[in-house]
Each structure stands twice: as structure tokens, then as C-alpha cells.
């Protein structure tokens, strides 16, 4: 078999054909590699694209099959076992081994169903406590659910107002005002037996009785014990009693009682702000004030008081009255009490009783912020004086 040339033509039998020179090759083509004896040249030895874009080749997309991996349970079990062995070794060495760990929960249902309690014997052994005793039972209190009728009935009872809140509410004598000293308050009384003493039986004959000879009967007295004799001879003890509530007394009755009493008593008399009488004369002087004028000079201006201010200054008060007798108290047959202040009549009535202790105190002030206080006595009753408008209107019409 004969060798072929680069064009693939058979060689002449006469002799070897000379090779083409490099000058005759096409421009842009790479020269063919020299032939090696004993080997054919490659099919893609030359560039057939002529400098263009390479042709795309189709390659099919093969979808790879996914295999689901199963969880490896054996590996996890081995890891947990190793961790347990490691924890046991740690508990066995060092200080504080076997310390109890407390886990606190917020509610009794948070931990779930309770497990069987186990007691640790040694490091590696556990003892079941099921045979030791009964398990703990949690008693849960059942809540009672109210029906709609019960709730409506409760609301009706709350809305009712036809009952008495305090049925035993009475005036308590312990809330009475305390008066000092206690010796004068009259809280100590003597208890005397109200039972009438038994009169001695007289066996003598009466005029109405029939004349019959009755033999004299003598009663033998038995000796008494010392305790019984001491009880009979003992005087009545002074018992502590609370005084009763004060009686509602009119002004006329109060004045009669005070007139018959030997001891004097103080009364609180409330008078109006303005009293009938002549106010003291006052020198009314105009008030001078300096005002700066437009020219910058100071000008003195006299200012007089308003009419209301002058009327207020002309009013008569208790401090303006002279010492001595101020008026007269009149007690009518009907029980009405009036106070005459000049030509003005004032009605006198009882004031509201106070639940606290009142005392009249005289205060004397000194020059250097010092003074003296003197208690004059207790004030028990209060009288209120109000103007009689009917008499005032009648006097005005006249």
C-alpha cells in the first residue's frame, strides 16, 4: 500500500511527487503540519469557519434524580447516649455533686402530665417509685356557673332600695362630747334598789279581826355565814353609767332653768353682722394721690370713697356698742322669746346642738408677741338672734 499526499491523491508509481511550496498557499490559512510517517492527519486539522463564529452544538439537558435522605436515628441516639454518660461523669467528680435543679413554672398545667417520680440510688442506677406509694393527685376546684336567671336576680337585689342599711342604727351615747374634768360630768351614779322593803309582820290583834287567842310563835334564827353578813351590810356600789341624750328644750324653758340655778352658766349668743345703733363719728379725709401729668409734672388728685364703702363704714357692729346693758329679753306667754335692741326686735331661737366640747377662752396679747389665755367655762347652749321682718315692715309703713 502506498502513502498518500496531503490532498489524498495516490502517488505516482514512477517516483515521489515534490511538495507544494508555501508561497502557493491561501492567505489566512495555516499551513498543514508536516506529515509524520505511520499516522494519518486529523480531520479537523484545518479551521473551516474562516474566522467566523463557532457553530453551536446541541447538548440535551438530563434531569438528575433526587433521592430523599432518611433521618439517621441511630446516630442521634448514639449522641444522646454519649451526652448522658458525659453528664454522669461530671456529676460524679468535683464539689457539689448531685445538686438539685429547680425549674419553676407559671402554672400547674404548664408542665403537662406528671411523670413517674424516680429516686436516684447510685450514679448509674435508678429506682422506680411506683411501688413505694401512691402518686400525687391534684384536686381542682370546679367553678360553679351561674345561670341567666340567677344573675338577673342578683342584679335586682342590688338595685333594690326599699331596705334599711343599718337596722340597729341608734344614737350612741359613747359619741357624746367629753367634758374635762370628769368629776363634773356626772357619769357616776349610785344604784339603789327600787324594791320596797318588806315590813315586819305584826302578830298583834286588829280591830276587824275576831278575838281569838293565838299562841305566840317564836322563829329560831339560824347562824349565818360571814360572807352573807358582809353582803347584807355592804353599801351600794357606785356604778358607771353613761348619761342620756340631752332633751330638746325651748328658749323659754332654758331661761327659766338658768334663773333658778344657783351656779352661773355661759350662753353663746349669735347676733347679726349689722346692729341697730349709732356708729362712732369718724373724720372722713379725702385720699390724696400724686399722678404724673402730660408735661411731666406731678399733680395731686383728691379721691373720695364710693357710696358702698361709706355705708360699710357707717354700719354699727358689736365692737362699736358701749359697755353695759345692750337690750332686753322678752318672754311671751306663747313661749316666744324676743330681744329688743332700741326700736328693733330680734327673734331668739335655739341653735344647732354641737357634738363637740366648746369652751370660752379669754386671750390677752402682749407687746412682744406674748399673751395669756384664760378658760372662762364651758359653753353648752347656743342662741341665734335673727331680725323680725314683720315688725320692721310695720315700722316702715308707719
Curated annotation (Swiss-Prot):
Q: Please give the biological process terms from Gene Ontology that the record holds.
A: defense response to virus; innate immune response; positive regulation of innate immune response; positive regulation of interferon-beta production; transcription by RNA polymerase III
* Chief subcellular location: nucleus
* Cross-link Glycyl lysine isopeptide (Lys-Gly) (interchain with G-Cter in SUMO2) residue location(s): 68, 78, 141, 152, 160, 190, 199, 206, 220, 285, 302, 396
Matching entries from InterPro entries are given as: RPC4
Spell out the residue ranges making up region: Disordered.
1-149, 191-244
Basic and acidic residues bias locations: 66-100, 116-128, 140-149
* Alphabetic keyword roster: Acetylation, Antiviral defense, DNA-directed RNA polymerase, Immunity, Innate immunity, Isopeptide bond, Methylation, Nucleus, Phosphoprotein, Transcription, Ubl conjugation
Q: Which residues carry this modification: N-acetylserine?
A: 2
Q: Which GO terms describe its molecular function?
A: chromatin binding; DNA binding
The Omega-N-methylarginine modification is found at 95, 97, 99
Q: Name one Pfam family in it.
A: RNA_pol_Rpc4
Family to which this protein belongs: Belongs to the eukaryotic RPC4/POLR3D RNA polymerase subunit family.
Q: How does it assemble?
A: Component of the RNA polymerase III complex consisting of 17 subunits: a ten-subunit horseshoe-shaped catalytic core composed of POLR3A/RPC1, POLR3B/RPC2, POLR1C/RPAC1, POLR1D/RPAC2, POLR3K/RPC10, POLR2E/RPABC1, POLR2F/RPABC2, POLR2H/RPABC3, POLR2K/RPABC4 and POLR2L/RPABC5; a mobile stalk composed of two subunits POLR3H/RPC8 and CRCP/RPC9, protruding from the core and functioning primarily in transcription initiation; and additional subunits homologous to general transcription factors of the RNA polymerase II machinery, POLR3C/RPC3-POLR3F/RPC6-POLR3G/RPC7 heterotrimer required for transcription initiation and POLR3D/RPC4-POLR3E/RPC5 heterodimer involved in both transcription initiation and termination.
| PANTHER family assigned | DNA-DIRECTED RNA POLYMERASE III, DNA-DIRECTED RNA POLYMERASE III SUBUNIT RPC4
Q: What protein does this entry describe?
A: DNA-directed RNA polymerase III subunit RPC4
